[in-house]
A protein has these predicted regions:
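Disordered, low-complexity tails and leader-like regions
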Residues: 1-2, 25
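Bacterial N-terminal signal peptides that target proteins for export
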Residues: 2-16
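Bacterial N-terminal signal peptides
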Residues: 14-25
Length: 190
């Protein structure tokens, strides 16, 4: 009887060990598949550091980040690879196709393509439309919210006319809603 119980214990331990190894290998394969599902991000810079524990890159000097759907240029970028958040400062330019977003600082999710530009300037090529604002928030694939907006279709730093307001919701299709709107020409409200 004791020999039979000893053999059953041994079989139970071996079975538990085998099941544990299967679970561990399945978890490892699942994690690798998840990593491979992530779209690649290519980072170029004069200097770069990587924190393995936090999974963050810090790139400085002529930083160029290529990601699915665009390119981010800046003097200094911290990329939180785990959360797909890039925080860029200094000469920041984000290109998404023919559209551009510039700012003193841009915090951008490279996976869902949303983010915020501070002291921002945006250009939408489809409608040849420029917007400046204290804060330009890309809320979706085709939608924006702007604080203290100034919008125009005129080229150059000093447009002949622009519409200014306190806040604005806009879509790439060219529709927008501005609060406290006023027409400004040659820098003066009309």
């Amino acid at each position: 009887v004791f020999i039979l119980i000893g053999k059953l214990k041994y079989k139970f331990i071996v079975t538990c060990f085998a099941m544990g190894m299967l679970l561990i290998s399945y978890t490892r394969v699942s994690a690798e598949e998840t990593k491979e599902d992530k779209k690649p991000v290519d980072i170029e810079a004069d200097s770069m550091d990587y924190d393995n524990f936090l999974d963050k890159y810090h790139a400085q000097g002529k930083v160029v980040i290529h990601y699915s759907g665009g390119v981010l240029n800046a003097d200094d970028v911290e990329l939180d690879n785990k959360n797909n958040i890039a925080t860029a400062r200094g000469n920041v330019l984000l290109k998404m196709g023919e559209d551009t977003l510039q700012g003193d600082k841009i915090v951008f999710n490279i996976e869902n393509k949303t983010g915020v530009a501070y002291k921002g300037r945006a250009f939408y090529s489809r409608n040849h439309f420029y917007i400046k604002g204290d804060k330009i928030e890309k809320t979706g694939e085709q939608t924006y919210f702007i604080q203290q907006p100034r919008a125009t279709t005129c080229d150059g730093d000093y447009p002949d006319w622009e519409i200014a307001g306190s806040e604005m919701d806009v879509t790439i299709e060219g529709y927008g809603l501005m609060k406290n709107a006023r027409l400004v020409t040659e820098g003066l409200p009309v």
